[in-house]
Amino acid sequence: MEDLQLVLFVLGAIAIVAVLVHGFWSIRRQQPKSLKDSPMGNFYKKQAERGEAAPAPKRVDAEGFDSDGIGAVRVRKASESQTPEAPAVNPYLKQEAKVEPQIEPKPQFKQEPSMAQPDFSLQSPSVDEPHRGTKASRQEPVLKSNTAHLNQEHAGQSHAAMVAQKVAEEQRAQVQKPTQTALFDDEVYQEQQPQAVEEAPETEESLGEPRDVLVLHVVAKEGQQLNGAELLPCFLTLNFKYGDMNIFHRHVDNAGNGKVLFSIANMVKPGVFDPDNMEQFSTLGVVFFMTLPCYGDALMNFSIMLNSARQLADDIDAVVLDGQRQPWGEFTKQDYLHRIRANA
């Protein structure tokens, strides 16, 4: 036991010494090298030992500048630094002559706004633009002497601009007038308006009296009833809208607008619904019915009604039956399709 303690003590001392040595070595390594340890110091030492002469000093001129234009550091007094000195002039660069700014005299006429100018030029631009450039260059030095001439010329141009603008407005009015009369012709509008009104009653009268009614029942399973709180959201999801005869109708438009395609009624008398009391309502089943002929494609309308009945039965766990309250099957489907074609 004592030998083990001795071994551990020796190992701990060795570890402490190693850590101290490593710390001193790291600190010494991070310190910057002195001038003696630098490589240039050794270079100068070797050069001195060989007896090589130091590089000759550079020659300086009378002003104290060497061949590279570098001179000795000079210390100036504060009074000297405050006195402004003229900038040095390079003799090799050409001195530009001082040009005094010339104030151009303003013309004694007012410029009209750009809105008074016409949209098109009265003269060809290829001939007018060079004359304007030469006229401006000639009149610039003698602007004061020709002020009256410029006033007359500007007045003539403004008058011509007003005349051109009036002509352009008259031409635009002549071009737009026939288009407006064609779009808003009272006689054509009065002739077409009664025709559109007369077409609607003809379409309604063409259906005539219903010759057949296609019926589908969605009934609850044996011993169960359909809850009104579940039926109402299903009706709204299937795009049915509460309306005439206190029942729900499926219209041409999903928003509840247009003609009625088919409807849903209560299977139990009196066959109506009360949307305000649907939570207290329960029934054995509901009836989908569609009259023939109907608006639009009868086959497409029946397909929508059949899919709606199946979707409702799946949502409320009910059963789809035909008009005789028999299970819906392929034979019944073919019979309904035959009745649709017969009344198309």
UniProtKB/Swiss-Prot annotation:
Keyword annotations from UniProtKB, A to Z: Cell cycle, Cell division, Cell inner membrane, Cell membrane, Membrane, Transmembrane, Transmembrane helix
Domain of life: Bacteria
InterPro entries cross-referenced by the UniProt entry: Cell_div_ZipA, ZipA_FtsZ-bd_C, ZipA_FtsZ-bd_C_sf
Membrane topology: Single-pass type I membrane protein
Subcellular location: Cell inner membrane
Gene3D superfamilies recorded: ZipA, C-terminal FtsZ-binding domain
Transmembrane segments: 7-27
Record SMART domains: ZipA_C (SM00771)
Cytoplasmic topological segments: 28-344
Record topological domains on the Periplasmic side: 1-6
Gene Ontology cellular-component terms listed: cell division site; plasma membrane
Principal localisation: membrane
GO biological process: division septum assembly; FtsZ-dependent cytokinesis
Region spans: Disordered: 75-94, 108-139
Cited function: Essential cell division protein that stabilizes the FtsZ protofilaments by cross-linking them and that serves as a cytoplasmic membrane anchor for the Z ring. Also required for the recruitment to the septal ring of downstream cell division proteins.
Alphabetized HAMAP family for the sequence: ZipA
Membership in a protein family: Belongs to the ZipA family.
Subunit structure: Interacts with FtsZ via their C-terminal domains.
Protein name: Cell division protein ZipA
Chain's gene name: zipA
